[in-house]
Amino acid sequence: MNNRTVDRCDYNVGEYINNRYRVSQTLGEGSFGKVYRVTDSASKDYALKLLRLWEVPPEIRKPLMERFEMEFKTGQIDCDYLVRSLDYGTVGGNPYIVMEYCSGGDLTPYLGSGSSKIPLICQQILIGLHALHTRGKVHRGLKPENVLFKSNGIAALTDFGIAGDRNKRMTERNIFGKPNQIFGTYAYMPPEQVNRMRGE
């Protein structure tokens, strides 16, 4: 894959992705991806995550696509407390994942709220993590923004982009045996991972 085979694919409200999904809202944007709220021909809402390969150096496109495909497969685990991946495709050489749309926002407003719902939410998060772990997956990106609420109020884990597979090593190591890549958000990393980053 090279620059000539990847098109720039930015979408505005009202435009169609692959003549199938109509964009109704931009939900978020990350380093290499953008998430849209889209509707299909039956007017059903979904979240569509587009990997913007046109912004990525050619030499890292292949490993990035491999990780994106693994994200899709992780999202196919059948559990009510995980945001489900429903479709995978490409547009202009850029891959996308279509997922359940969660209309209830994320966990952030509950932090420090003292809400009586928190014990149930924690239970649902743990069930989601258990579903991942029993299939050899490690989320590695658990934070309030990655816990979404479905329309029925159920909490579900999302964003499996940096999820690990206990049966595969995707983290490169340097000549000293230390990881070259550290996955996760610093503020939510366990102390032992932060200590490894510091060389302790």
Stretch-by-stretch model annotation:
Residues G92-D106:
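Conserved short submotifs of the Hanks-type protein kinase catalytic core
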Residues D106-S116:
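AlphaC helix of the protein kinase catalytic domain
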Residues Y88:
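Activation-segment/catalytic-loop signature of the eukaryotic protein kinase fold
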Residues I121-C122:
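Activation segment signature within eukaryotic-like protein kinase domains
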Residues K34:
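Conserved N-lobe ATP-binding subsite of Hanks-type protein kinase domains
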Residues E55-Q76:
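AlphaC helix of the eukaryotic protein kinase fold
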Residues I127-K137:
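Protein kinase catalytic-loop region centered on the HRD/HxD motif
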